[in-house]
Structures are given as C-alpha cells and as structure tokens.
C-alpha cells in the first residue's frame, strides 16, 4: 500500500548475475514487470560504478514530488564487486522535475467556489501529514470558517476538540462527519487518494 498511501520507501532486491538476466535462470524474477504498477520507479543496477549514484537517486525520487516506493534490483555480480563508498553531492535526473509550484489560476477558482458555496466542507487526507501542512490546513479552515472532516489517514491533522472538526468519514468514521459530506454543497478534497469503490449514483 506504500504507493497508494504515498509512503517514501526504498526497497533493495537481489537478482541473478547480469549476464543471466532474461534467460529464465534459476531464481531469476522479472522484478520490473512484477512491481511496475505498484512502484513509483524501478531501477536495475547493471554496473557497480553506477550503484552509489542510483542509490542517491532512489531516495531522492522516493521522497520528492508525490512520495512513493522505489525499488533497486541488485544483480549478484554487482553486489560482489568492490567499489567507491562516495556518493554524489547533488541529484540531477533528466526528465524528472517534480512540480511543486502552485497553480494560481486554480487557487483563485477554488476560492471563488468556496465563497459562493453555502455549505462548503474540507475533506483532508493523509497527504497533509506527508507534506507537513497541518498548521497551514488549520489556519486555512479557521480563516475561512469552513468545517473539516478527514480520512482515516488524515486523522490527527486537525485537533479532535476543534470546533470546526466533525471527525473522520467512511465506514469507520462517525455519523456527524458522514452526514456533513452528504449535506455540503461543495466538498474541497485536499491531499488525499480517492477510492474507486462504487458510490451512491444519486451523489455527484
């Protein structure tokens, strides 16, 4: 679940020697194919001289942008070879430039929708914890005077005794929070993963 929960995780797996990869060798596994859909990035280390750089890149990719799991596959001959223990100072990966800048047009549109709504409601997920945005989320809801509900992963972002906090939603949530979602005319989802489970066709 590290991918869905945006958990920065670096995994190391063992592999047969590089000259045996792709030959259906005993104990060989197509780890790239197995993990492609559940990992943020998968790297097969082919040369010992690339190992330190790739380890540095793996940790960088795992914790930047949308955090997630990264896997390094280490062939037997690469692990057996001696090499330098120095790591590069900086990481520069061509084609990987996480966008962390806010989109001012989208922010303005969201603010207009909030001001026009009669019963707006914030739904905050665990991404707020990962981003370290607890203080900012509390300040935003207090400034706008908009109530908040959370997902299970988002529990703890808002103090449970806060007057604007209704609790967490869903099957394991409470009645007040679930009813608030049903009654709101604008649901502002922040930093969460939306489930593909079937929903009530009467809702929009």
Each predicted region: which residue ranges?
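Anionic-ligand anchoring segments at beta-strand to alpha-helix junctions in alpha/beta enzyme folds, i.e.
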Residues: 116-183
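Alpha-helix C-terminal capping segments
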Residues: 1-9, 143, 183
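Glycine-rich beta-alpha junction loops
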Residues: 16, 74-80, 126-128, 155
């Amino acid at each position: 679940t590290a991918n869905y929960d945006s958990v920065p995780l670096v995994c190391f797996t063992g592999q047969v020697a590089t000259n045996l990869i792709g030959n259906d060798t005993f104990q060989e596994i197509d780890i790239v194919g197995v993990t492609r859909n559940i990992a943020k990035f998968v790297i097969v280390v082919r040369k010992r001289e690339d190992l330190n750089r790739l380890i540095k890149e793996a940790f960088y990719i795992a914790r930047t942008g949308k955090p997630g799991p990264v896997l390094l596959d280490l062939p037997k001959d690469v692990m057996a070879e001696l090499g330098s223990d120095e790591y590069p100072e900086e990481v520069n990966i061509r084609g990987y430039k996480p966008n962390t800048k806010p989109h001012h047009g989208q922010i303005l549109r969201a603010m207009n929708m909030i001001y026009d709504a009669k019963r707006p409601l914030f739904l905050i997920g665990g991404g707020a914890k990962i981003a370290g945005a607890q203080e900012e989320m509390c300040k935003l809801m207090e400034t706008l005077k908009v109530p908040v509900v959370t997902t299970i992963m988002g529990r703890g972002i808002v103090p449970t005794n806060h007057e604007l906090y209704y609790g967490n939603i869903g099957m394991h949530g409470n009645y007040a929070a679930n009813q608030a979602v049903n009654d709101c005319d604008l649901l502002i989802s922040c930093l969460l993963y939306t489930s593909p489970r079937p929903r009530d066709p009467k809702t929009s």
